[in-house]
Design a protein with these regions (language model features):
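Transmembrane beta-barrel architecture of outer-membrane proteins
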Residues: 55, 96-100, 151-155, 204-208, ...
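Positively charged n-region of N-terminal signal peptides that target proteins for export
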Residues: 1-4, 20
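Repeated loop/turn-to-beta-strand initiation elements of outer-membrane beta-barrel proteins
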Residues: 110-113, 166-168, 219-223, 255-258, ...
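Sec-dependent N-terminal signal peptides
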Residues: 4-13
C-alpha cells in the first residue's frame, strides 16, 4: 500500500512538473504571438492611412480672418502723414472671407518643400470723422472717401524633421513670405475736378524661421501645428513677421481629407523710397477650412 502511494506521489509530481513546463512554453509562445500580432497590426494600420506620409499634398479652402490694419504714408516732400486705422477711420470690415491654397512635396523621409498662397481684397466707403493726411493730399472732416486694400501673400518654406516617427514628426522650418500690397484712398467729389486720390504699393520679402509638428491621433485624425518669426531689413524694406497655425485633419475617404484650423499672421513693414515713405502694419487671425488631397508614393517612416 505504501509503495502504491509513493508511486502515485512520484507520478503526480512528474505530471505537475511537465505540465508547468508546457504551460510556460505555451504562455511564452502566446506572448510572442500577441506581440507580433500587435506589431503587424500597428504596421498594417499605418499602411492603411492613405492620407499620411504621401509624397505630395495639395489643399484649397477658405479663410475667415479678423483684420487689424494701420497705414501711414508720407508725401513727396518727405513729411509723414498721420497714422490711419483702416477699420476705425475708413470703415473697413474687420471680418472678411478670403481664399487660401497650399502644396507640399515630401522630398525624403525628413525633408519637405511647401508653397502657400493667400489673397485678400477689401474696399470701403465712409464719411470721415477726422482729417486724414495720406500721400500728397489732406482729406478733410465730413468728406466722403473710398478706400481699397489688395494683399497677396506667397510663401515658400523648407521643413526638416529632426524627429521622424511613423505616428509623429517634429522639425524646423526656414522660408519666406513675399507680400504684394497696394492701398489707396480717393476723395469722392461732386465733379471730376474735385476728386483726387493717393495710393501706396510695395513688395516685401519677409524671411522667417520656425518649428512644426505633425501627429497621427487616430486612424482618421491628424494634427498639424507650426509657429514662425523673423525680423530683417532687406534693401529699403524693414519688416517683422509672426505667424502661427493649428489645424486638425479628418480623413473622409482614402486620400481625401478635410482640415479645419486656426491661423494668424502679424506683419509690420517700413518702406523707404526716394520720394515716398510708408509704414504698414497688418494683422489677421481666424478659422480656416480646406479640402486636402494626398497622392504619390508613401515615404518610408521608421520606428527607430
Amino acid at each position: 500500500m505504501k509503495k502504491l502511494l509513493y508511486l502515485l506521489i512520484v507520478f503526480f509530481l512528474g505530471f505537475a512538473s511537465q505540465a508547468q513546463i508546457v504551460a510556460e512554453a505555451t504562455l511564452k509562445d502566446s506572448l510572442v504571438n500577441v506581440k507580433d500580432e500587435s506589431i503587424n497590426y500597428q504596421n498594417q494600420t499605418l499602411d492603411d492611412l492613405s492620407w499620411h506620409g504621401r509624397r505630395f499634398k495639395v489643399s484649397a479652402g477658405v479663410f475667415f480672418p479678423t483684420n487689424n490694419t494701420e497705414v501711414e504714408v508720407g508725401s513727396n516732400n518727405g513729411e509723414f502723414g498721420n497714422l490711419i486705422d483702416f477699420e476705425k477711420d475708413l470703415g473697413f470690415n474687420k471680418n472678411t472671407v478670403s481664399f487660401a491654397a497650399a502644396f507640399e512635396w515630401r522630398i525624403s523621409r525628413r525633408s519637405r518643400l511647401g508653397t502657400e498662397y493667400f489673397y485678400l481684397k477689401r474696399t470701403a466707403s465712409k464719411v470721415l470723422q477726422r482729417e486724414i493726411e495720406f500721400g500728397d493730399h489732406v482729406y478733410p472732416v465730413d468728406a466722403r472717401v473710398s478706400a481699397f486694400m489688395d494683399n497677396q501673400i506667397y510663401r515658400l518654406v523648407y521643413g526638416y524633421a529632426f524627429i521622424s516617427k511613423p505616428t509623429y514628426e517634429i522639425g524646423a522650418l526656414i522660408g519666406a513670405h513675399v507680400m504684394f500690397a497696394d492701398v489707396g484712398i480717393r476723395l469722392e467729389g461732386n465733379t471730376a475736378q474735385a476728386e483726387y486720390r493717393d495710393n501706396f504699393d510695395f513688395t516685401a520679402p519677409l524671411p522667417d524661421l520656425g518649428l512644426w509638428g505633425e501627429f497621427v491621433l487616430a486612424d482618421k485624425w491628424g494634427l498639424y501645428v507650426n509657429a514662425n518669426y523673423f525680423a530683417l531689413k532687406v534693401d529699403n524694406v524693414d519688416g517683422r513677421l509672426l505667424s502661427y497655425n493649428l489645424s486638425v485633419l479628418y480623413n473622409v475617404y482614402k486620400n481625401f481629407s478635410i482640415t479645419a484650423g486656426y491661423t494668424g499672421l502679424n506683419i509690420r513693414v517700413d518702406v523707404e523710397r526716394e520720394r515716398l515713405n510708408g509704414f504698414f502694419k497688418w494683422g489677421y487671425n481666424g478659422p480656416t477650412i480646406a479640402a486636402t488631397y494626398a497622392f504619390g508614393g508613401r515615404v518610408k517612416l521608421y520606428k527607430h
